[in-house]
């Protein structure tokens, strides 16, 4: 595999959907041989949108972190191969006891969180979990 970016020259995206989309469109236009993008947080669904808008579906694929409807849609379309769900409710629930243990006893608790890879066959279940988390029906 040939990596176009590295830790020292990574792509600078943001939490703003429009800017992230534009960064990915520019990146893919300048690097038409890219085949795979890994992204975190909101970025993957906007990389997916950029791939689709440039007509690169089936040529460029993604994987992304955290659950979103846009990523689940892209998995169903075959653009995104998986979503790595960090399980937000578990993340949130861990913070209070971890802080309490550290502040009271100086103990750093090990991370008990498990990562859940969501592929095409798990999209329906992931949508239900996301809707429950976001209280969207």
Regions found by a protein language model. Name each.
Residues 1-137:
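A residue-level marker of the well-folded mature domains of exported/periplasmic proteins
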């Amino acid at each position: 595999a040939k990596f176009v970016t590295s830790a020292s020259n990574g792509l600078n995206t943001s939490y703003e959907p429009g800017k992230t989309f534009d960064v990915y469109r520019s990146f893919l236009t300048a690097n038409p041989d890219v085949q795979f993008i890994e992204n975190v947080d909101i970025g993957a669904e906007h990389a997916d949108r950029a791939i689709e808008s440039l007509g690169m579906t089936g040529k460029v694929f993604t994987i992304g972190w955290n659950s979103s409807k846009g990523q689940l849609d892209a998995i169903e379309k075959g653009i995104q191969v998986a979503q790595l769900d960090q399980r937000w409710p578990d993340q949130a629930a861990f913070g209070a006891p971890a802080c309490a243990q550290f502040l009271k006893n100086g103990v750093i608790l090990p991370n008990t969180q498990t990562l859940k890879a969501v592929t095409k066959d798990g999209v329906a279940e992931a949508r239900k979990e996301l809707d429950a988390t976001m209280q969207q029906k």
